[in-house]
């Protein structure tokens, strides 16, 4: 694709609205081609390094399947499979991998790490997730929303994110809304709002693109008329146990449940989640939450909503692969 060749994919605001739209169009085409058996391999002979300082199911599988579909080969470097930042600097790692690979994916910690990789690798670098941003997830989310509201422009849609909005998902949603004009409402306790500077920047851009960004603590007001309600986990296994009670007390009123879905007043409202979700007690963490905090039947989302017809979370999960494929094809093929 013109203009994308050898570009990095580090955060959404590195792109223009037109470029973002082009990536979504390419993803939709690649998805249709795969389904119809007409996919054309554009990455034959390419070698791709996947650096994972944080484990992941969806991100790893998406990159691997997308690469294989397109004829590329991958090397997985897991949390214990490389010396990045420990025995070898990020700068040196970038220069080594850049001599061997045609593209590098990084999923891990600070945004400065993926930025340094991009500065020194000499090949396209893609952000699979950092503490600050999760751009590949938002590409999948935008494609999923387009599929479920065909014919509607993003500035005619309303997305609500309920819960902890100060994380990489909240930041990337702000950037997505800025570029698309998507009506975005972050419904969260004020302590869980993103940094004011990013909100201000993205709100100004969103208004230029016909959209609006709202932050509110009021659940009923925030979800009214929503087309999509989105949430993410409140706690993770890596966090100190003392944080769990504090986080749950802060966010309990922002659980996505049938009452919240009904408060939208939209019988066609859809539920989104980037996964994994703690919607039951069938996981180690889910059991702990149920036993210690009485969160039976779900934490950030109830099992009832997660398993309902309104839930399109597995469409999202599939679209991770198609949109990641679009990023690789756009940046590695002329």
Swiss-Prot record:
Gene3D superfamilies: Aspartate/ornithine carbamoyltransferase. It holds the Pfam family OTCace_N. SUPFAM superfamilies: Aspartate/ornithine carbamoyltransferase. GO terms for molecular function: amino acid binding; ornithine carbamoyltransferase activity. Carbamoyl phosphate binds at residues 56-59, 83, 107, 134-137, 274-275, 320. The keyword Amino-acid biosynthesis applies. It comes from the Bacteria. It catalyses: carbamoyl phosphate + L-ornithine = L-citrulline + phosphate + H(+). Its EC number is 2.1.3.3. Its main location: cytoplasm. It is found in: Cytoplasm. InterPro entries: Asp/Orn_carbamoyltranf_P-bd (IPR006132), Asp/Orn_carbamoylTrfase (IPR006130), Asp/Orn_carbamoylTrfase_sf (IPR036901), Asp_carbamoyltransf_Asp/Orn-bd (IPR006131), Orn/put_carbamltrans (IPR002292), OTCase_ArgI (IPR024904). PROSITE patterns: CARBAMOYLTRANSFERASE (PS00097). Belongs to the aspartate/ornithine carbamoyltransferase superfamily. OTCase family. PANTHER family: ORNITHINE CARBAMOYLTRANSFERASE SUBUNIT F-RELATED, ORNITHINE CARBAMOYLTRANSFERASE, MITOCHONDRIAL. Reversibly catalyzes the transfer of the carbamoyl group from carbamoyl phosphate (CP) to the N(epsilon) atom of ornithine (ORN) to produce L-citrulline. This is Ornithine carbamoyltransferase. It comes from Shigella dysenteriae serotype 1 (strain Sd197).
């Amino acid at each position: 694709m013109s203009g994308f060749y050898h570009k990095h994919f580090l955060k959404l605001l590195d792109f223009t609205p037109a470029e973002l739209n082009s990536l979504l169009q390419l993803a939709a085409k690649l998805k249709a081609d795969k389904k119809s058996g007409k996919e054309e391999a554009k990455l034959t002979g390419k070698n791709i390094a996947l650096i994972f300082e944080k484990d992941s199911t969806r991100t790893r599988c998406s990159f691997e399947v997308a690469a294989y579909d397109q004829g590329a080969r991958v090397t997985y470097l897991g949390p214990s499979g490389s010396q990045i930042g420990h025995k070898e600097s990020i700068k040196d790692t970038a220069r080594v991998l850049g001599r061997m690979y045609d593209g590098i994916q990084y999923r891990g910690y600070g945004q400065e790490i993926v930025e340094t990789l991009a500065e020194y690798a000499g090949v396209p670098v893609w952000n699979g997730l950092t503490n600050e941003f999760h751009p590949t997830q938002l590409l999948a989310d935008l494609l999923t929303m387009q599929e479920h509201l065909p014919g509607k422009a993003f500035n005619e849609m309303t997305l609500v994110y309920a819960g902890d909005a100060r994380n990489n998902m909240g930041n990337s949603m702000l950037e997505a809304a800025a570029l698309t004009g998507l009506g975005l409402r972050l419904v969260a306790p004020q302590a869980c709002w993103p940094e004011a500077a990013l909100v201000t920047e993205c709100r100004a851009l969103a208004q230029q693109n016909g959209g609006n960004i709202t932050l509110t603590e009021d659940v009923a007001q925030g979800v009214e008329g929503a087309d999509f309600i989105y949430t993410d986990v409140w706690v993770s296994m890596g966090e100190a146990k003392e944080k769990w009670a504090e986080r749950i007390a802060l966010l309990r009123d922002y659980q996505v449940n049938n009452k919240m879905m009904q408060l939208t007043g939209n019988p066609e409202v859809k539920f989104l989640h980037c996964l994994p979700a703690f919607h039951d007690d069938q996981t180690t963490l889910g059991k702990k939450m149920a036993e210690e905090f009485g969160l039976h039947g779900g934490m950030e989302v109830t099992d009832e909503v997660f398993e309902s017809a309104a839930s399109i979370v597995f469409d999202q999960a599939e679209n991770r692969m198609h949109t990641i494929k679009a990023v690789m094809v756009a940046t590695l093929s002329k």
